[in-house]
């Protein structure tokens, strides 16, 4: 019997696609190829990877991007170091990637977002996408925590999101 790779669905305001919050494909006793097949079957048209290359190597997941693309899905790699807030490289890359993520969701395809465990950095990126669609920060965090209770447990993540929230609302 095939084991199921876990993911939690989240609607995005004003868009047809959903966010699929998930641990790293291949890290939950489900082979990576099977996990990706399951995410694709659930409607994923893209995968946003938030793990660093070093983390991917430690997990034996360096081929993740190639496998995602081989399945016909889009792969977006925006690494954030574990237990840290996004750095300048993320901040610089985000404006170029965000429109592509939203376009995918606008087309009704789902976006799988993952870090290693599928909570911390995953919740951060999901909240940012929800906030760019007009959802208030606290509401976005509440929706994500309902699915991933360990999201936003790090002060650096909450502080970074507070700063982004002020920028999005023009209060900064």
Language-model regions: role of each:
Residues 1-112, 124-172:
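Cys-dependent protein tyrosine phosphatase-like superfamily
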Residues 118:
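Conserved G/P- and acidic residue-centered "switch" motifs that form tight phosphate/ATP-binding loops
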Residues 121:
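Conserved SAM/SAH-binding loop-helix junction
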